[in-house]
Amino acid sequence: MATVSMRDMLKAGVHFGHQTRYWNPKMKPFIFGARNKVHIINLEKTVPMFNEALAELNKIAARKGKILFVGTKRAASEAVKDAALSCDQFFVNHRWLGGMLTNWKTVRQSIKRLKDLETQSQDGTFDKLTKKEALMRTRELDKLENSLGGIKDMGGLPDALFVIDADHEHIAIKEANNLGIPVFAIVDTNSDPDGVDFVIPGNDDAIRAVSLYLGAVAATVREGRSQDLASQAEESFVEAE
């Protein structure tokens, strides 16, 4: 199963927190000290906590669970999308729309509209419209794809959230809490760990650190899914006998 070592984390700068003046006292148990007015995260805590989170995500994936990757900061946006797609999961990498989880019924209607517009753009419907109407629908399609494209095939609520930056994505975390959906999150020294079921203390800004987290999560999810596919194959083999 995918794991991450102390050396990997040091190379990626996972241990660099935020400036000391911006700290959240609730993160004190995970802080090693400070250097040049920047908090240093205790990787002796982070390594086992992250690997525990990876093991749990592996189990969720192995039982066909849906994992929603959330990271809407510009620096993480593309990496979040790439990681989710690489393991056939789902993502929100632009703005989190309030009610995305708690008002799923309405979101489902918007997804239906998105899919209808996609069909229209491909079957020649747009070509039959006036230029103005075609432009309006193209803009609507782009807007919906931007906000819902990563969840349009999710088919229901996710079984877990993996979040880059608990502070920035606090609305998503609160919605997951309300619905009892487990939250796995990167929590930096300026963030509140409350509401996060699997806290991963670490740098949430450095792209190398973000890439490390996402790469490991995607790998463990792929492994979990392959276990599920292997067990399905075994079952069908037994039935065939």
From Swiss-Prot:
SUPFAM superfamilies: Ribosomal protein S2
CDD domains reported for this sequence: RPS2 (cd01425)
Domain of life: Bacteria
Entry keyword set: Ribonucleoprotein, Ribosomal protein
GO MF entry, a single one: structural constituent of ribosome
Gene Ontology CC terms: cytosolic small ribosomal subunit
Any single biological process term in GO: translation
InterPro entries named among the record's database cross-references: Ribosomal_uS2, Ribosomal_uS2_bac/mit/plastid, Ribosomal_uS2_CS, Ribosomal_uS2_flav_dom_sf
Record has Ribosomal protein as a keyword: yes
PANTHER family xref list: 30S RIBOSOMAL PROTEIN S2 PROKARYOTIC AND ORGANELLAR, SMALL RIBOSOMAL SUBUNIT PROTEIN US2M
Family stated for the protein in its record: Belongs to the universal ribosomal protein uS2 family.
HAMAP family: Ribosomal_uS2_B
Protein name: Small ribosomal subunit protein uS2
Species assigned in the record: Klebsiella pneumoniae subsp. pneumoniae (strain ATCC 700721 / MGH 78578)
GN (gene name): rpsB
